[in-house]
Protein backbone atom coordinates (compact mmCIF):
# COMPACT_ATOMS: atom_id res chain seq x y z
CA UNK A 1 0.00 0.00 0.00
CA UNK A 2 1.45 3.35 -1.03
CA UNK A 3 0.09 6.65 0.27
CA UNK A 4 1.31 9.98 -1.13
CA UNK A 5 0.85 13.28 0.72
CA UNK A 6 1.09 16.37 -1.50
CA UNK A 7 1.75 19.50 0.55
CA UNK A 8 3.64 17.47 3.14
CA UNK A 9 5.81 20.32 4.47
CA UNK A 10 2.84 22.43 5.57
CA UNK A 11 1.13 22.40 8.94
CA UNK A 12 -1.54 19.89 7.93
CA UNK A 13 0.87 17.86 5.81
CA UNK A 14 3.44 17.37 8.57
CA UNK A 15 0.79 16.43 11.15
CA UNK A 16 -0.80 14.03 8.66
CA UNK A 17 2.56 12.49 7.74
CA UNK A 18 3.42 11.92 11.41
CA UNK A 19 0.09 10.21 12.07
CA UNK A 20 0.32 8.05 8.93
CA UNK A 21 3.90 7.00 9.81
CA UNK A 22 2.64 5.73 13.15
CA UNK A 23 -0.68 4.26 11.99
CA UNK A 24 -0.43 2.88 8.45
CA UNK A 25 -0.39 -0.93 8.17
CA UNK A 26 3.04 -2.57 8.43
CA UNK A 27 4.72 -2.79 5.04
CA UNK A 28 3.13 0.41 3.72
CA UNK A 29 5.03 3.08 1.81
CA UNK A 30 4.56 6.76 2.62
CA UNK A 31 5.61 9.29 0.01
CA UNK A 32 5.89 12.98 0.93
CA UNK A 33 5.92 15.80 -1.62
CA UNK A 34 6.03 19.56 -1.30
CA UNK A 35 7.47 22.39 -3.33
CA UNK A 36 9.47 23.38 -0.20
CA UNK A 37 13.09 22.14 -0.09
CA UNK A 38 12.65 20.95 3.51
CA UNK A 39 10.44 18.01 2.45
CA UNK A 40 13.12 15.29 2.11
CA UNK A 41 14.25 16.33 5.59
CA UNK A 42 10.74 15.93 6.99
CA UNK A 43 10.85 12.37 5.63
CA UNK A 44 14.27 11.71 7.20
CA UNK A 45 12.99 13.07 10.53
CA UNK A 46 9.93 10.80 10.40
CA UNK A 47 12.03 7.82 9.25
CA UNK A 48 13.57 7.63 12.73
CA UNK A 49 10.19 6.66 14.22
CA UNK A 50 10.25 2.87 14.72
CA UNK A 51 7.31 1.68 12.64
CA UNK A 52 7.28 -0.66 9.64
CA UNK A 53 6.32 2.13 7.23
CA UNK A 54 8.88 3.13 4.59
CA UNK A 55 9.04 6.85 3.98
CA UNK A 56 10.59 9.03 1.29
CA UNK A 57 10.42 12.77 0.66
CA UNK A 58 10.48 14.71 -2.60
CA UNK A 59 10.77 18.45 -3.22
CA UNK A 60 10.66 20.72 -6.26
CA UNK A 61 8.24 21.75 -8.98
CA UNK A 62 7.22 18.25 -10.10
CA UNK A 63 5.40 15.78 -7.82
CA UNK A 64 5.62 12.91 -10.34
CA UNK A 65 8.37 10.91 -8.54
CA UNK A 66 6.29 10.92 -5.35
CA UNK A 67 3.17 9.72 -7.19
CA UNK A 68 4.52 6.67 -9.04
CA UNK A 69 2.55 3.62 -7.88
CA UNK A 70 0.43 5.50 -5.34
CA UNK A 71 -2.78 3.80 -4.18
CA UNK A 72 -3.98 6.80 -2.19
CA UNK A 73 -3.14 10.49 -2.74
CA UNK A 74 -3.98 13.07 -0.06
CA UNK A 75 -3.66 16.71 -1.14
CA UNK A 76 -3.18 19.44 1.47
CA UNK A 77 -1.03 21.80 -0.62
CA UNK A 78 -1.98 25.47 -0.74
CA UNK A 79 -2.14 28.58 1.41
CA UNK A 80 -3.88 28.61 4.78
CA UNK A 81 -6.53 30.97 6.06
CA UNK A 82 -5.56 34.06 8.03
CA UNK A 83 -7.82 36.20 10.24
CA UNK A 84 -10.39 38.07 8.16
CA UNK A 85 -10.18 35.58 5.27
CA UNK A 86 -12.86 33.06 4.50
CA UNK A 87 -12.29 29.84 2.58
CA UNK A 88 -13.28 31.48 -0.72
CA UNK A 89 -10.46 34.03 -0.38
CA UNK A 90 -8.14 31.04 -0.77
CA UNK A 91 -9.64 30.19 -4.15
CA UNK A 92 -7.46 32.52 -6.21
CA UNK A 93 -4.24 30.81 -5.09
CA UNK A 94 -5.32 27.27 -4.28
CA UNK A 95 -7.38 26.64 -7.42
CA UNK A 96 -4.26 26.73 -9.60
CA UNK A 97 -2.27 24.59 -7.18
CA UNK A 98 -4.93 21.85 -7.13
CA UNK A 99 -5.33 21.95 -10.92
CA UNK A 100 -1.58 21.50 -11.47
CA UNK A 101 -1.26 18.67 -8.94
CA UNK A 102 -4.29 16.80 -10.27
CA UNK A 103 -2.89 17.01 -13.81
CA UNK A 104 0.15 15.10 -12.50
CA UNK A 105 -2.01 12.60 -10.61
CA UNK A 106 -4.06 11.98 -13.77
CA UNK A 107 -0.87 11.33 -15.73
CA UNK A 108 1.01 9.27 -13.12
CA UNK A 109 -1.46 7.33 -10.93
CA UNK A 110 -4.89 7.75 -12.55
CA UNK A 111 -6.50 4.90 -10.58
CA UNK A 112 -5.40 6.16 -7.14
CA UNK A 113 -8.01 7.21 -4.59
CA UNK A 114 -7.66 10.98 -4.24
CA UNK A 115 -8.62 12.89 -1.09
CA UNK A 116 -8.72 16.68 -1.31
CA UNK A 117 -8.03 18.71 1.83
CA UNK A 118 -7.07 21.99 0.14
CA UNK A 119 -9.70 24.67 0.71
CA UNK A 120 -12.15 25.77 -0.51
CA UNK A 121 -13.05 22.05 -0.73
CA UNK A 122 -16.52 22.76 -2.19
CA UNK A 123 -14.70 24.20 -5.20
CA UNK A 124 -11.34 22.38 -5.35
CA UNK A 125 -13.03 18.97 -5.65
CA UNK A 126 -15.00 20.24 -8.65
CA UNK A 127 -11.71 21.49 -10.16
CA UNK A 128 -10.12 18.07 -9.65
CA UNK A 129 -13.07 16.32 -11.30
CA UNK A 130 -12.96 18.61 -14.36
CA UNK A 131 -9.19 18.16 -14.77
CA UNK A 132 -9.58 14.37 -14.60
CA UNK A 133 -12.45 14.46 -17.11
CA UNK A 134 -10.23 16.41 -19.52
CA UNK A 135 -7.52 13.77 -19.08
CA UNK A 136 -10.06 10.99 -19.70
CA UNK A 137 -9.42 9.30 -16.34
CA UNK A 138 -12.30 10.54 -14.16
CA UNK A 139 -13.87 7.94 -11.87
CA UNK A 140 -16.34 9.53 -9.46
CA UNK A 141 -15.84 6.64 -7.04
CA UNK A 142 -12.17 7.58 -6.57
CA UNK A 143 -12.40 11.30 -5.77
CA UNK A 144 -13.22 12.63 -2.30
CA UNK A 145 -13.41 15.97 -0.57
CA UNK A 146 -12.29 15.27 2.98
CA UNK A 147 -14.93 16.70 5.33
CA UNK A 148 -13.92 14.55 8.30
CA UNK A 149 -12.86 17.62 10.29
CA UNK A 150 -16.53 18.66 10.45
CA UNK A 151 -17.36 15.17 11.73
CA UNK A 152 -14.69 15.04 14.44
CA UNK A 153 -15.58 18.57 15.59
CA UNK A 154 -19.23 17.53 15.80
CA UNK A 155 -18.31 14.44 17.82
CA UNK A 156 -16.16 16.49 20.18
CA UNK A 157 -18.59 19.35 20.74
CA UNK A 158 -21.59 17.02 21.24
CA UNK A 159 -19.66 14.90 23.77
CA UNK A 160 -18.58 18.04 25.66
CA UNK A 161 -22.08 19.53 25.72
CA UNK A 162 -23.83 16.32 26.77
CA UNK A 163 -21.14 14.72 28.95
CA UNK A 164 -20.90 11.66 26.69
CA UNK A 165 -17.96 9.37 25.97
CA UNK A 166 -16.76 10.84 22.68
CA UNK A 167 -15.93 7.35 21.35
CA UNK A 168 -19.66 6.56 21.45
CA UNK A 169 -20.79 9.66 19.54
CA UNK A 170 -21.61 9.07 15.88
CA UNK A 171 -22.90 11.87 13.68
CA UNK A 172 -23.37 12.37 9.95
CA UNK A 173 -22.37 15.77 8.58
CA UNK A 174 -23.80 16.50 5.14
CA UNK A 175 -23.65 19.25 2.52
CA UNK A 176 -20.29 20.86 1.96
CA UNK A 177 -17.20 22.02 3.83
CA UNK A 178 -17.61 25.71 4.54
CA UNK A 179 -19.92 27.92 6.56
CA UNK A 180 -23.63 27.29 6.05
CA UNK A 181 -22.96 24.30 3.77
CA UNK A 182 -21.75 22.30 6.80
CA UNK A 183 -24.81 20.54 8.27
CA UNK A 184 -24.44 18.17 11.24
CA UNK A 185 -27.50 15.93 11.57
CA UNK A 186 -27.89 16.35 15.32
CA UNK A 187 -31.40 14.87 15.28
CA UNK A 188 -29.86 11.48 14.48
CA UNK A 189 -27.35 11.36 17.35
CA UNK A 190 -28.13 8.34 19.51
CA UNK A 191 -28.23 8.79 23.27
CA UNK A 192 -28.62 12.57 23.16
CA UNK A 193 -31.49 15.01 22.76
CA UNK A 194 -31.06 18.70 22.08
CA UNK A 195 -33.25 21.74 22.67
CA UNK A 196 -33.93 23.99 19.68
CA UNK A 197 -31.49 26.51 21.17
CA UNK A 198 -28.78 23.85 21.52
CA UNK A 199 -29.30 22.72 17.93
CA UNK A 200 -28.99 26.27 16.63
CA UNK A 201 -25.91 27.16 18.69
CA UNK A 202 -24.14 23.81 18.17
CA UNK A 203 -24.76 23.90 14.41
CA UNK A 204 -23.35 27.43 14.22
CA UNK A 205 -20.34 26.50 16.35
CA UNK A 206 -19.53 23.51 14.12
CA UNK A 207 -19.92 25.66 10.99
CA UNK A 208 -17.64 28.37 12.39
CA UNK A 209 -15.12 26.16 14.21
CA UNK A 210 -12.45 26.82 11.59
CA UNK A 211 -12.73 30.54 12.22
CA UNK A 212 -12.54 29.87 15.98
CA UNK A 213 -9.09 28.31 15.43
CA UNK A 214 -7.90 30.97 12.96
CA UNK A 215 -8.78 33.73 15.44
CA UNK A 216 -7.32 31.87 18.43
CA UNK A 217 -4.01 31.42 16.58
CA UNK A 218 -3.99 35.22 16.06
CA UNK A 219 -2.47 35.21 12.59
CA UNK A 220 -0.24 32.22 13.32
CA UNK A 221 -2.17 29.76 11.18
CA UNK A 222 -5.38 27.78 10.83
CA UNK A 223 -6.60 24.35 11.94
CA UNK A 224 -3.61 22.16 11.08
CA UNK A 225 -3.36 19.57 13.84
CA UNK A 226 -7.05 18.66 14.06
CA UNK A 227 -7.21 18.64 10.24
CA UNK A 228 -4.17 16.34 10.17
CA UNK A 229 -5.99 13.97 12.52
CA UNK A 230 -9.18 14.15 10.44
CA UNK A 231 -7.28 13.50 7.19
CA UNK A 232 -5.45 10.58 8.77
CA UNK A 233 -8.72 9.03 9.93
CA UNK A 234 -10.17 9.36 6.44
CA UNK A 235 -6.97 8.21 4.70
CA UNK A 236 -6.77 5.11 6.90
CA UNK A 237 -10.40 4.34 6.09
CA UNK A 238 -9.55 4.52 2.37
CA UNK A 239 -6.64 2.12 2.99
CA UNK A 240 -8.82 -0.27 4.99
CA UNK A 241 -11.41 -0.27 2.22
CA UNK A 242 -8.75 -1.00 -0.40
CA UNK A 243 -7.54 -3.91 1.71
CA UNK A 244 -11.03 -5.42 1.69
CA UNK A 245 -12.12 -4.64 5.24
CA UNK A 246 -15.93 -4.63 5.50
CA UNK A 247 -18.29 -1.91 6.71
CA UNK A 248 -15.94 1.07 6.40
CA UNK A 249 -18.25 4.10 6.31
CA UNK A 250 -17.21 7.77 6.31
CA UNK A 251 -18.86 11.02 5.33
CA UNK A 252 -17.17 12.67 2.35
CA UNK A 253 -17.89 15.31 -0.27
CA UNK A 254 -18.44 13.28 -3.43
CA UNK A 255 -20.00 13.11 -6.87
CA UNK A 256 -22.55 10.62 -5.56
CA UNK A 257 -25.64 11.23 -7.65
CA UNK A 258 -27.16 13.39 -4.91
CA UNK A 259 -30.53 14.93 -5.66
CA UNK A 260 -29.25 18.15 -4.07
CA UNK A 261 -26.07 19.08 -5.96
CA UNK A 262 -23.45 17.57 -8.27
CA UNK A 263 -21.13 17.25 -5.26
CA UNK A 264 -22.55 16.66 -1.79
CA UNK A 265 -21.14 15.40 1.50
CA UNK A 266 -22.89 12.27 2.70
CA UNK A 267 -22.01 8.84 4.13
CA UNK A 268 -20.26 6.46 1.75
CA UNK A 269 -19.32 2.79 2.04
CA UNK A 270 -15.64 2.42 1.13
CA UNK A 271 -14.06 -0.59 -0.54
CA UNK A 272 -11.60 -1.86 -3.14
CA UNK A 273 -12.83 0.61 -5.78
CA UNK A 274 -13.12 3.63 -3.50
CA UNK A 275 -16.83 4.28 -3.10
CA UNK A 276 -18.68 0.95 -3.13
CA UNK A 277 -22.00 2.59 -2.34
CA UNK A 278 -23.35 6.03 -1.56
CA UNK A 279 -25.52 5.64 1.53
CA UNK A 280 -28.71 7.55 2.35
CA UNK A 281 -28.19 10.06 5.14
CA UNK A 282 -31.54 9.21 6.70
CA UNK A 283 -34.44 11.17 8.16
CA UNK A 284 -33.80 14.79 9.06
CA UNK A 285 -35.60 17.27 11.30
CA UNK A 286 -37.48 20.30 10.01
CA UNK A 287 -34.56 22.52 11.11
CA UNK A 288 -32.10 20.33 9.17
CA UNK A 289 -34.30 20.13 6.06
CA UNK A 290 -34.57 23.91 6.02
CA UNK A 291 -30.80 24.35 6.56
CA UNK A 292 -30.08 21.84 3.78
CA UNK A 293 -32.41 23.52 1.30
CA UNK A 294 -31.13 27.01 2.13
CA UNK A 295 -27.46 26.06 1.60
CA UNK A 296 -27.90 24.68 -1.92
CA UNK A 297 -27.52 27.94 -3.85
CA UNK A 298 -24.25 28.62 -2.02
CA UNK A 299 -23.01 25.07 -2.63
CA UNK A 300 -23.96 25.06 -6.31
CA UNK A 301 -22.24 28.43 -6.74
CA UNK A 302 -19.05 27.04 -5.17
CA UNK A 303 -19.16 24.04 -7.53
CA UNK A 304 -19.78 26.20 -10.61
CA UNK A 305 -16.76 28.33 -9.69
CA UNK A 306 -14.56 25.21 -9.90
CA UNK A 307 -16.06 23.94 -13.15
CA UNK A 308 -15.70 27.37 -14.79
CA UNK A 309 -12.10 27.69 -13.57
CA UNK A 310 -11.02 24.60 -15.53
CA UNK A 311 -13.15 25.32 -18.60
UniProtKB/Swiss-Prot annotation:
It is an enzyme of class 1 (oxidoreductase). It comes from the Bacteria. Substrate binds at residues 81, 87, 119, 153. SUPFAM superfamilies: LDH C-terminal domain-like, NAD(P)-binding Rossmann-fold domains. Disulfide bonds: none annotated. NAD(+) binds at residues 7-13, 34, 94, 117-119, 227. Its EC number is 1.1.1.37. The keyword GTP-binding does not apply. GO terms for cellular component: cytoplasm. GO terms for molecular function: L-malate dehydrogenase (NAD+) activity. The active site is at residue 177. Homodimer. Catalyzes the reversible oxidation of malate to oxaloacetate. PANTHER family: MALATE AND LACTATE DEHYDROGENASE, MALATE DEHYDROGENASE, MITOCHONDRIAL. Belongs to the LDH/MDH superfamily. MDH type 1 family. This is Malate dehydrogenase. It comes from Shewanella baltica (strain OS223). The gene is mdh.
Amino acid sequence: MKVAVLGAAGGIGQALALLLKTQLPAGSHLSLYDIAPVTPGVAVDLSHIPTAVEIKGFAGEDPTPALVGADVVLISAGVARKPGMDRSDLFNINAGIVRNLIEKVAATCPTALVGIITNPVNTTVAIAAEVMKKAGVYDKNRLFGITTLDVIRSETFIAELKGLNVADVKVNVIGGHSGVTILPLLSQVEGATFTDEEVASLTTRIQNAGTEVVEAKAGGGSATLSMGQAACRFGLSLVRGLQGEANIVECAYVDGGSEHAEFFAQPVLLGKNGIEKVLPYGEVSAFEANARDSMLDTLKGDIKLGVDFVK
